[in-house]
């Protein structure tokens, strides 16, 4: 029996309050309105940014259905939708691409002005949500809300992908992989023969390493205080791994000594102010490029001596690896299917959706790279 045009009752993980576990609830998901798409989720990754909402280091309205790194199948579409149809495999996009705003029209930049990242509303574009639970409206999360068996997104926040793609793997392209990989190949524009340093070896940091290797870097130095992550980093392309705790001097000085004055490209993939500074200073003063990839804490400022930049260093940042989402996500899935990069090594755990709190425990304990929840 078709569910198009009807309210769907399903399971979702609702975060009612900060610092609390997710609650598996029976929710109602309303049909998509004009220019909206309802998706039956198949798989979703668990990302550190979701946990930032739990801890309130990232502000977003609650109660909410979180999750933003998923893949699924279109169940129904609202009036006027032309880019996808029921049955299509899709990836929801936490960075939408309206195609009309100043940023979407820019040849390089990607953070569409209709995003829900800068000042989160926790709604779809029309200012409302399609989720209700116990008679109460439940907020969306950054245009996606993948921690639900069904979700509704704006058409500008969904991309059709290869119908043969394995959704339990390519869901990582919805956030973590693309963010890291793009930071290397698109934002920094790593060059063949160059030297790179990557601070932080979670799923995004390892994806930076994959990108540096794909771009032809000659040396990729992985930096983390957890030595258990070194083997995986080397498997994916790191040529050396170092632990800052093994040295009595600042890690930027160690890297400068290792690389004749500093690396060509450095990446901070943790979200700490001190490592952002270390990453900046570890790249060469005259030609280095440092990229902020990790999400920093809310309402904190970074103080840097301007002389650190005056001699020629560049300091950059980008969301979603600088990729224009609707244009790039289908191409990235095609590249994965063509074996141009791996995703499997990033997935350390696959759990049923109902075990979402166990997945977050693994994340917080540093025991997982990416956990994929399946519906």
Swiss-Prot record:
Q: What class of enzyme is it?
A: oxidoreductase
Query: Does the keyword field hold Plastid?
Result: no
Q: A single GO molecular function, which one?
A: all-trans-retinol dehydrogenase (NAD+) activity
Give me the residues that bind Zn(2+) 2, please. 98, 101, 104, 112
The record's EC number reads 1.1.1.1
Report the superkingdom from the record.
Answer: Eukaryota
Subcellular localization: Cytoplasm
Protein's name according to its UniProt entry: Alcohol dehydrogenase 1
Cofactor(s) recorded in Swiss-Prot or TrEMBL: Zn(2+)
Q: Which organism is it from?
A: Peromyscus maniculatus (North American deer mouse)
Q: How is the cofactor bound?
A: Binds 2 Zn(2+) ions per subunit.
Sequence positions that bind NAD(+): 200-205, 224, 229, 293-295, 370
Annotated SMART domains: PKS_ER
Task: State the Gene Ontology BP annotations.
Answer: retinoic acid metabolic process; retinol metabolic process
Question: Which controlled-vocabulary keywords does the entry list?
Answer: Acetylation, Cytoplasm, Metal-binding, NAD, Oxidoreductase, Zinc
SUPFAM superfamilies cross-referenced by the UniProt entry: GroES-like, NAD(P)-binding Rossmann-fold domains
A single Gene Ontology CC term: cytosol
Describe the reaction catalysed, as an equation: a primary alcohol + NAD(+) = an aldehyde + NADH + H(+); a secondary alcohol + NAD(+) = a ketone + NADH + H(+)
| Main localisation | cytoplasm
Q: Which family does it belong to?
A: Belongs to the zinc-containing alcohol dehydrogenase family. Class-I subfamily.
N6-succinyllysine modification sites?
234, 340
Q: Which residues carry this modification: N-acetylserine?
A: 2
Query: Which residues are noted in the entry as Zn(2+) 1-binding?
Result: 47, 68, 175
């Amino acid at each position: 029996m078709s569910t198009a045009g009807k309210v769907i009752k399903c399971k979702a993980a609702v975060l009612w309050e900060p610092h609390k576990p997710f609650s598996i609830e029976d929710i109602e998901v309303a049909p998509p309105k004009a220019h909206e798409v309802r998706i039956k989720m198949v798989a979703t990754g668990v990302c550190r940014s979701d946990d930032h909402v739990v801890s309130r280091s990232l502000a977003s309205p609650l109660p909410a259905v979180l999750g933003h790194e998923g893949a699924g199948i279109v169940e129904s579409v609202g009036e006027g939708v032309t880019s996808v149809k029921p049955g299509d495999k899709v990836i929801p996009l936490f960075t939408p691409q309206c195609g009309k705003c100043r940023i979407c029209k820019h040849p390089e930049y990607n953070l569409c002005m209709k995003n829900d990242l800068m000042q989160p509303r926790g709604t779809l574009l029309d200012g409302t949500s399609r989720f209700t639970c116990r008679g109460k409206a439940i907020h969306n999360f950054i245009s996606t809300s993948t921690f639900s068996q069904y979700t509704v997104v704006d058409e500008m926040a969904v991309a059709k992908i290869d119908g043969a793609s394995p959704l339990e793997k390519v869901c990582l392209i919805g956030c973590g992989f693309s963010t890291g990989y793009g930071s290397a190949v698109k934002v920094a524009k790593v060059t063949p023969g160059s030297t790179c340093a990557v601070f932080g070896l979670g799923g995004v940091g390892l994806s930076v390493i994959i990108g540096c290797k794909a771009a032809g870097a000659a040396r990729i130095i992985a930096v983390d205080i957890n030595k258990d992550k070194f083997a995986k980093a080397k498997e994916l392309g790191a040529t050396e791994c170092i632990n800052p705790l093994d040295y009595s001097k600042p890690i930027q000085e160690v890297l400068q000594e290792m690389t004749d004055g500093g690396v060509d490209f450095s990446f901070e993939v943790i979200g700490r102010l001190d490592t952002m500074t270390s990453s900046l200073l570890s790249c060469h003063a005259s030609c280095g490029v440092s990229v902020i990839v990790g999400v920093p804490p809310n309402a904190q400022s970074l103080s840097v001596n301007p002389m650190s930049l005056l001699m020629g260093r560049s300091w950059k940042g980008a969301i979603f690896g600088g990729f224009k989402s609707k244009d790039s996500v289908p191409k990235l899935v095609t590249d994965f299917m063509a074996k141009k990069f791996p995703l499997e090594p990033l997935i350390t755990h696959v759990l049923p959706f109902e075990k979402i709190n166990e997945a977050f425990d693994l994340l917080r304990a540093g025991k997982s790279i990416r956990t994929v929840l399946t519906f």
